[in-house]
Amino acid sequence: MSWLTPELTEILITVGKAIVILLVVVTCGAFMSMGERRLLGLFQGRYGPNRVGWGGSLQLVADMIKMFFKEDWVPNFTDKVIFTLAPMIAFTSMLIAFAIVPITPTWGVADLNIGILFFLMMAGLAVYAVLFAGWASNNKYSLLGAVRASAQTVSYEVFIGLSLMGVVAQAGSFNMRDIVDSQEHLWNVIPQFFGFITFAIAGVAVCHRHPFDQPEAEQEIADGYHIEYSGMKFGLFFVGEYIGIVTVSALMVTLFFGGWHGPILPPFVWFALKTGFFMMMFILIRASLPRPRYDQVMSFGWKVCLPITLLNLLATAAVILYNA
């Protein structure tokens, strides 16, 4: 076909890869919700969901049908435009953040020279979704949850950024593929161990996952900024949270554990196995740890995480200058 030029073919292939990768991420986020319930049941000596389909295999389908047919109710006292916009921002910001993650040497959505900065920007955008939801709901518990979430997320994003600067300094680039290539012989988790620990803790906090789920603590503030949401709007918040877990897990693999590098197995298999391991760790943390007070969470961040990241960055700079 005369209109199908090599340039157009390359564009179509790139767009096709992007669509496939993002659909897989959404699917992983959805399946993780079911896998989490099964694993929590295993950890706690329960059966978990096992009634729908063989061994509970169709539970996710049943949940999707239930959510589709639930009334998507918008209370009269809300700011309807902002109330509707908030879950869309929460979902898309975490999904777009995954775009900079290289899965294999040839598969990825966007190869940006400012990859890490792009992730930090998308993570910051997710704060607006929480603020919009809390303010537009016109509910005291929702607003309190939004204030908690914004303060917690902004604080721990500082520690995420500082923990990644050591990796950037070692690789000499913000590009994610360059960072993966720099780990061909030695994973960053060894020279940047304290940076990894801080990134892992801050990643859990930014995802609002247990034990850092104070913004939506059911026992304290009745699910926080989610309180007035139902139907598919709540579903976007729900799936967006799990997409955030997938994204943070993939970033840990890419930045600290060599990305797709590994012996014998194909690159995609190594990337999937490493990412799946960290997704399981999110679930194990939820099953194992209690929820601290909100002031303890903020105090831990500024009094423990910040000094560790600064010392790690200073040590990295000293080593680089010494080797130079």
Curated annotation (Swiss-Prot):
<comment type="function">
    <text>NDH-1 shuttles electrons from NADH, via FMN and iron-sulfur (Fe-S) centers, to quinones in the respiratory chain. The immediate electron acceptor for the enzyme in this species is believed to be ubiquinone. Couples the redox reaction to proton translocation (for every two electrons transferred, four hydrogen ions are translocated across the cytoplasmic membrane), and thus conserves the redox energy in a proton gradient. This subunit may bind ubiquinone.</text>
</comment>
<dbReference type="GO" id="GO:0005886">
    <property type="term" value="C:plasma membrane"/>
</dbReference>
<keyword id="KW-1278">Translocase</keyword>
<feature type="transmembrane region" description="Helical">
    <location>
        <begin position="237"/>
        <end position="257"/>
    </location>
</feature>
<keyword id="KW-0520">NAD</keyword>
<dbReference type="GO" id="GO:0009060">
    <property type="term" value="P:aerobic respiration"/>
</dbReference>
<feature type="transmembrane region" description="Helical">
    <location>
        <begin position="186"/>
        <end position="206"/>
    </location>
</feature>
<dbReference type="Pfam" id="PF00146">
    <property type="entry name" value="NADHdh"/>
</dbReference>
<dbReference type="GO" id="GO:0003954">
    <property type="term" value="F:NADH dehydrogenase activity"/>
</dbReference>
<keyword id="KW-1003">Cell membrane</keyword>
<feature type="transmembrane region" description="Helical">
    <location>
        <begin position="11"/>
        <end position="31"/>
    </location>
</feature>
<feature type="transmembrane region" description="Helical">
    <location>
        <begin position="114"/>
        <end position="134"/>
    </location>
</feature>
<comment type="subunit">
    <text>NDH-1 is composed of 13 different subunits. Subunits NuoA, H, J, K, L, M, N constitute the membrane sector of the complex.</text>
</comment>
<feature type="transmembrane region" description="Helical">
    <location>
        <begin position="154"/>
        <end position="174"/>
    </location>
</feature>
<dbReference type="GO" id="GO:0048038">
    <property type="term" value="F:quinone binding"/>
</dbReference>
<keyword id="KW-0812">Transmembrane</keyword>
<feature type="transmembrane region" description="Helical">
    <location>
        <begin position="304"/>
        <end position="324"/>
    </location>
</feature>
<protein>
    <recommendedName>
        <fullName>NADH-quinone oxidoreductase subunit H</fullName>
        <ecNumber>7.1.1.-</ecNumber>
    </recommendedName>
</protein>
<comment type="similarity">
    <text>Belongs to the complex I subunit 1 family.</text>
</comment>
<dbReference type="InterPro" id="IPR001694">
    <property type="entry name" value="NADH_UbQ_OxRdtase_su1/FPO"/>
</dbReference>
<dbReference type="GO" id="GO:0016655">
    <property type="term" value="F:oxidoreductase activity, acting on NAD(P)H, quinone or similar compound as acceptor"/>
</dbReference>
<keyword id="KW-0472">Membrane</keyword>
<keyword id="KW-1133">Transmembrane helix</keyword>
<feature type="transmembrane region" description="Helical">
    <location>
        <begin position="264"/>
        <end position="284"/>
    </location>
</feature>
<keyword id="KW-0830">Ubiquinone</keyword>
<keyword id="KW-0874">Quinone</keyword>
<keyword id="KW-0997">Cell inner membrane</keyword>
<dbReference type="InterPro" id="IPR018086">
    <property type="entry name" value="NADH_UbQ_OxRdtase_su1_CS"/>
</dbReference>
<feature type="transmembrane region" description="Helical">
    <location>
        <begin position="81"/>
        <end position="101"/>
    </location>
</feature>
